[in-house]
Amino acid sequence: MGNHKAALTKQVFTFASELYAYGVREVVISPGSRSTPLALAFEAHPNIKTWIHPDERSAAFFAVGLIKGSERPVAILCTSGTATANYTPAIAESQISRIPLIVLTSDRPHELRSVGAPQAINQVNMFNNYVSYEFDMPIADDSKETIDAIYYQMQIASQYLYGPHKGPIHFNLPFRDPLTPDLNATELLTSEMKILPHYQKSIDASALRHILNKKKGLIIVGDMQHQEVDQILTYSTIYDLPILADPLSHLRKFDHPNVICTYDLLFRSGLDLNVDFVIRVGKPVISKKLNQWLKKTDAFQILVQNNDKIDVFPIAPDISYEISANDFFRSLMEDTRVNRVSWLEKWQCIEKKGRKEIKCYLEQATDESAFVGELIKKTSEKDALFISNSMPIRDVDNLLLNKNIDVYANRGANGIDGIVSTALGMAVHKRITLLIGDLSFYHDMNGLLMSKLNNIQMNIVLLNNDGGGIFSYLPQKESATDYFERLFGTPTGLDFEYTAKLYQFDFKRFNSVSEFKNATLLSETSTIYELITNREDNFKQHQILYQKLSEMIHDTL
């Protein structure tokens, strides 16, 4: 028994030290018995911060938020059995978004698998469709090979924690009773750093010259890292190219004349210009209308993504590059300048008129877009916005016009799962205000526990239209009128003031835009600001905006 304890201690302390060596500074633990050895190892490590969350689904999304905020890999740990399956939604989001989430599932020893033992399900390869790498670790013993396996496997897995290959990885770790390591053996816990992987690629600019010398070009930028925007702006300025900037591109922070923000409303309103080439950068954009245009345009399409797996949605490009945006545009700086002044000015003119129409609309509107517009005004440059999927991200796409704030969202799988938890994870590292609808909020109310337990400050702006507002914009609204409210509207009638009390948030309710205009978003306390809206009225007022912009496009072109 003494040998078992020594072997277990060496295994889990070495594993914790190797995670630290490859950049892990935070671990989110969901309590359980089988995970005891690793949980104690992480708690004993002097340079690893542990977070405790009893809900595995919310815990995993909280870790996703920590990664977004710190730009470092984060590990999650749970016990064996069905607890592990609750990680699946966050792992799926991480896979599509290229987030280096390290999934650690504790398991029963091999002799207790498939024999009816409690809390034992098949955990080997259980996330096979969503992880970049996975390994079923050997059980602790006295052999050198068992410890070597940790070194080898972490070295292999590290390529998925940094660079273009980023994504979630899964280690399944079986533990045999007794489960308690020797906590006095702290000399086995080390804080040495490994040399992290570095990736660099170049392109042959001459191969693109015949395309980029054409006059009518666009740069379309989706979700991407802050540090990749500099060369995009420089290239756009030198070569007179409009930039259609998604709200997650971090380009709308800049008051730059080439940054176009109103394109979703413009394309929705009938804008259809002939274009010679498009340079698509980063992940796919949020705008459905822009994606539809990309599918039908005859323009030559170049895709630039710093990933090992290129996301071609909405349509496969003519050519793609696995390279950072900075490296791509830097390599093109020697090209001959093309006179595109009239082309750029046309876009700038349309953008200016579009912004004017939006401003006039917001001065009169009383719908959700008016609330969102006010929130954007109230958000200081010290704060960032985390935006829920469904209608909130679409309204922000339409209404965020060049303000120096960062915007974040879970746009991998685009689901409403785990939004509260992800935002709270980010709030550990940044000042965050969360904009979310009532159904998305209900879906992850458990996530609020992390704020209560750890005193994490975050404001939540809750758009409450008592149901799923986005369905009012879909064909189901007209084709299934008798069943629409029950199947799609899904009103809940919940009073979220009780939620605020349960998790010790302050609570303020606003029944009109005018009330909200006079409100102050406090940064010292966590507050839920509930904004009461009406789905039908919201739909009708949005149609008015679309019509005004359609008339403007018709008159301009």
Swiss-Prot record:
SUPFAM superfamilies: Thiamin diphosphate-binding fold (THDP-binding) (SSF52518). Its EC number is 2.2.1.9. Keywords: Magnesium, Manganese, Menaquinone biosynthesis, Metal-binding, Thiamine pyrophosphate, Transferase. Signal peptide: none annotated. It is an enzyme of class 2 (transferase). PANTHER family: 2-SUCCINYL-5-ENOLPYRUVYL-6-HYDROXY-3-CYCLOHEXENE-1-CARBOXYLATE SYNTHASE, PROTEIN PHYLLO, CHLOROPLASTIC. Catalyzes the thiamine diphosphate-dependent decarboxylation of 2-oxoglutarate and the subsequent addition of the resulting succinic semialdehyde-thiamine pyrophosphate anion to isochorismate to yield 2-succinyl-5-enolpyruvyl-6-hydroxy-3-cyclohexene-1-carboxylate (SEPHCHC). This is 2-succinyl-5-enolpyruvyl-6-hydroxy-3-cyclohexene-1-carboxylate synthase. It comes from Staphylococcus aureus (strain bovine RF122 / ET3-1). The gene is menD.
